[in-house]
Regions:
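ABC transporter nucleotide-binding domains
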Residues: 1-90, 95-109, 114-115
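Aromatic-residue hotspot detector
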Residues: 58, 132-135
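ABC-family P-loop ATPase nucleotide-binding domain
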Residues: 139-140
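Hydrophobic aliphatic residues
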Residues: 2, 78, 123-126, 136
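Conserved beta-strand-loop-alpha-helix hinge in the C-terminal portion
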Residues: 112-133
Length: 140
């Protein structure tokens, strides 16, 4: 992946070591990926996505298969990327995660945008779960 993104060799090894260490993958990097658990494959995919230091990431359910420690680490990495001027679009069915991590929220139902905006505005005085359930009731 580092080759595909033309990450210089001098830069890639420190980045691989950094992210592998943070995601507890260091001792497993020499193993065949086919021997990895689902969670380890998810960590490797995240490491691969970060290796070229992107400004934009698009992630589909990035926390599925991760243990709580790895999920916490990934949340921190996502926040760091955004705090440094990057952006992340990610899908999740866990509304509490979206509420804690996201500055902007969009709720999509059957491929149609139902509501979007700053997290604080979308959730109002309730939670995202409250908003979602209310939207579901309105839809029925």
């Amino acid at each position: 992946v580092a080759d595909a993104f033309k990450v210089p060799k001098k830069k890639r090894n420190p980045l691989i070591e950094k992210y592998a260490g943070m995601l507890a993958l260091t001792k497993d990097l020499g193993q065949l990926v086919s021997s990895y658990s689902h969670g380890m494959k998810q960590k490797l995919a995240i490491l691969s996505a970060l290796i070229h230091e992107p400004k934009l990431m698009i992630l589909d359910e990035p926390f599925v298969g991760l243990d709580p420690v790895a999920a916490h680490t990934v949340k921190g990495l996502m926040r760091e990327l955004c705090d440094n001027g990057g952006a992340i679009f990610f899908s999740t069915h866990v509304l509490e995660v979206a509420e804690k991590l996201c500055d902007q929220i969009a709720i999509i139902r059957q491929g149609k945008l139902i509501v979007s905006g700053p997290t604080e505005e979308v959730r109002g005085n309730g939670s995202l779960e409250d908003v979602f359930l209310e939207l579901e009731e309105d839809h029925e």
